[in-house]
Structures are given as structure tokens and as C-alpha cells.
Amino acid sequence: MTVDPVLAINQNLGIAEMMDYVGQLQDEMIEHRRDLHAHPELLYDVVRTSGKVAELLEEWGITVRRNVGKHFGMGVVGLLQGLAGNGSTLLLRADMDALPIREGNELPYKSVNDGIMHACGHDAHTAMLLGAARTLAAFRERLSGTVIFVFQPAEEGAVKSPRDGRLLSGGRDLIEDSVLEGVDYAYALHVMPELPVGTLGIHPHYAMAASSHFKVGFQGTSGHHSAPHQAVDAIQMAARYIGEINGMMANRIDPQEAAVLAFGTLQAGTAINVIAEHSELTGTFRAFTKRTVAAITNGLQRHASAIAESYGGKYKLELREGITVVNNAEAVQQVLHAALAVLGEDQVILLEQPSLAGEDFGWYLEKVPGAFAFIGCGNKEKGIVHAIHQPQFNIDEAMLVHGARILVRLAIQHNGSASGKQK
């Protein structure tokens, strides 16, 4: 693995002292993570979580901006100005929201909110960034430039804006409220149980796919099964649509480009002997290039229109396009250097295959250079093997220190100074 030698850090910066400080915060980070895990909140409804985060940042002397987000106002942003002079502005992001999943783990800190669970590690992401924020605040005399700590709601989905009706995830909501103003680089870490604790994986270019959601409604006319010629069957329109879209994915999308589409729900009908007048399909599709996303989007529209016309019905298509997470080459080098220093060379992996899962950190990386990396949280010996979004998902909490140390090193690599002492 080749790492740019110009990223080498002079040891007189006291990096070892800062790494030790992070280690001393291990129990505190575990406590924060478990508290958040026990009290998960969904999407933009992160009142308790955001309040806790803001209070801690303020306690550590970090300037806090609450209620961030042009449309929903549930984000928290911490601003730390280094005291060693001017430098670049670095953004470090963690997501705060949980998932509508009933937890399957029997833990002392099991979710108290039935049907809601931190099954994607956002509790860990928040705890790691809190640890990094406290450390950098304690050593701000050694820091030049600015570090922005972004705690984001609603990574797991989009909600219709009360302002303009658009479907917005938390990343877009915060970006529209100027969180990227003046930012030079942006970074985020995400837990990955497929990687053992003590490791980090990163893709050199594409990290995650653009994950887009769609909903198609077909409107026909109801009628009795004895007289199908007097009705327009919305179930038949939906069934034909499923077949045609699957055919489109097999025959009209470039097989050299990774793409996948799947239907998730189909709702139709009210009685066993009545032709359904309405049907509704939902699903997702995932791809990496704008060309493929456009091809699928156009196909969804074209086939819905043609089917509705051929049956004499109507249709409505709603679409929320995702965005690909594209890592910047220089930022990847920064992550590699930080991870190698924290974990060791054998523990850092250049991932060959990008993930077809989605992540709205792509909206950040569309605007500014940066990188998105995966930090190992699995431990087979402890039975921590379940994938994200599963009821039995868990993490080896030793990864919290690893992640916080990597985030701290990223800040120092961009904005380190040899002067100053711990506050």
C-alpha cells in the first residue's frame, strides 16, 4: 500500500499525547454510546440526542449552533477554532438517527423505545465524534485552522419538507443551511461489522452507490370480477410494470456498470371479488454513475406512462434520487495515513468493490473534497457478526477509540502545529 510521504507528521506535535488522551476517554465514549443506544430516535425526531450532543460540546468550550437545517432544524454543529494560527477548515460528520427495527439483543442498554433501534451504528458514530471533539478542544493550542463537528439527523431516509414539499435527507437539509460554507475537506466514518475491530477499509474512488427510492401509483376503475371489460385493473398494470422494469434492468442497462433495482411493497385491492381501482408499488434502485441513474429514472417513467395508456388508466411516479459517495484521491491518502498510524499497516484495507448501499454523505462530497471510510466493529469471538439493519446488530466497543483517534489525526494532519499545550 502506497501512502504519500508528504503526509508524514512530525512527532514533536505531541501526537502520542493526544492519542493517549483519546484512550482515557474510552469509558466515557462507551457510556455515551450506550446512552444513545438505549434512547434511539428516528429521522428528524432527534430531540433528546441533539440536545445531549449540544450540551456536551458546550461543556467542552466548543461554539455550538443548534437547530441547524433550513427545513427541519434538528442538526447540531460545533465550531472549534484552533489557536495556533490560520489553516484549512475541516468538517467531521456523524449521523444521529436510528431505524424502525425492534431490537433483538438482550443488553443492559437495550432500546427502551419499542420498535426503534440503533441498528446502523449511528450511536457509535456520534460517540466517536464526541470523543474526537473533546480531544481536539483540549489540545486547541496545537491546532491551526478550524474544525467543524456536524451531527446530522435523518441519514436513514428523507422526509417531505414543510417549506417546499421536496423529499430531503438530513445531509441536504444541513447543506442548504450553509454547513459547508468555507469547508476545505469533509470526512466521515461508518461502522462495518464485516471488518474485524481494529481495522479500517476505504474505497479509492466510489465508496457507495446512489440509492434512489421510487413510488408508482396506477389508477384504474373498479368493477366486479364477472365483468372485467367494464373496469381497468390496477393490479394488472402493477404486475405488468414489475415485469417490464425487471426486463429493462436485464436488457437496457449497461451490464458493465453495477446497478440493482428491487420492489419492496405492492398494495392493491379491497375485496376478493372486486377489480382493484388503485395499486401502488415502492422500491429502490442503486447505481454509481449519473448516466445509469438517468437511464433507470427515464425507464421508470417511460414504462409507467406506456402501461397506463395501454390500459386506459393513469399513473403517478414519485422519485427521490440518491447520490453516489465519491472519495477524493488526496482525502483518501489522508485517511490511509491516519489509519496506518493508529491501526498499523496490516489493519488498513483498500476495498476493491464499492458498496451498493446508500449514504447521504455523498451530498457533502459533491460540494467539497473528502472521504468516507468504513471502520471495523465485528468480533466473531464475541458473536458480533450480524450485519447492519439486523435486529441482532451490535459492535465491539473497542472500535470507538480507534475511530476517534483516526478523526483526531485527520484534523492534526490538516491543521497541526508544534506549539501549544493541552488546555
Residue ranges, per PLM feature:
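Metal-dependent amide/peptide-bond hydrolase catalytic core
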Residues: 3-10, 236-423
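Divalent metal-coordination and catalytic microenvironments
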Residues: 36, 92, 122, 149, ...
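Histidine-centered active-site/metal-ligand motif
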Residues: 37-39, 44, 118, 122-125, ...
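Short glycine-enriched loops at secondary-structure junctions
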Residues: 94-99, 192, 209, 266-269, ...
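Acidic/His- and Gly-rich active-site-bordering loop/insert found
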Residues: 4-118, 127-145
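Non-cysteine beta-strand/loop elements that form the S-adenosyl-L-methionine
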Residues: 91-93, 214-217, 372-377
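Histidine/acidic-residue-rich, glycine-tolerant segments that coordinate divalent metal ions
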Residues: 74, 105-117, 123-124, 136, ...
